[in-house]
Amino acid sequence: MEAYALTDTGRVRSMNQDYIYASPEKVGFLPDLFLVADGMGGHKAGDYASRFMVENLVVYLNHRTQLKEGIKTVNKALYEMSLEREEFQGMGCTLVAAVIEEGILYAANVGDSRLYLIHDGAIRQITRDHSYVEEMVAMGMMQRGSADYNRKKNIITRAAGIKPDIEPDFFEEELEQGDYILLCSDGLSNMVDNDTMCSIVLSEGTLKEKAVRLIAEANKRGGTDNIAVVLVKPQEGGMGSC
C-alpha cells in the first residue's frame, strides 16, 4: 500500500485550517488509517478544532478499534473544549476517515469533506455531504450545480464539535487491483471537477506528484479555500483513463 498526504493554504486564506493524517502502517489494532478534517471558526478556533479532532482520534485508535466510538468520543471532548474557552466558542470541523483491511474500504464522514473511489477509469464519490444543498437535492427541491446550489453549497448541516453527540455516516466498498482512494476537503472538490480529479489521479507519476498536481489545479482555479488531499493506492495494478 502507498499513500501521500498534502495540504495547502490556498490563494485567499491567511491560515490553513485543514488537517491531515495518513498512515499506511498499523495504527494500534487497525491496519492503516487516513484522515482529513476541515476546521471552522474564527481566528485560530478552526485550526485548533481540526488538529484536535485528528490528533485525538489517532490517540484513541492506538488503543481501540471502534472508529465510530472514537469519532463520538473525540467529538464530545471537542464540544466540551468549546464551552470552556471563549475564543473557541462555535468551533468545529468536518471529518472524513478511511481504513482499508483485506481489500475492503471502510469510510466514515461528518460534514462535506469527501472520499472518492477511482475505479476502472472512473471516479465516484463514496461519502455523502452533510450539507443544506445536498439535503435539498435529496428532497427534489434543488438541482445540483444550479446557481442556488452553488451559492449555498458551503452551508453544512453536520460537523464535529458543534453538539455533544454526533452521528457519522459509514460506508463499505470492496476494492480491486488498480483502485485509488482520494480523501479531500472542499477546497479541492469545490474548485476541481470530478473528471479533472480523475485524470490527474490516473496520470503518470508518483502519488506525491499527483497530490501536488491536484492542489496546483485547485489553486489555478482560484484557490479560495484551504486544500487537503490524501491519496491512497491500496494495491498494485494498471491505470485506466477517465
Q: How should each PLM-predicted stretch be described?
A:
Residues M1-C242:
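PP2C/PPM-type serine/threonine phosphatase catalytic domain
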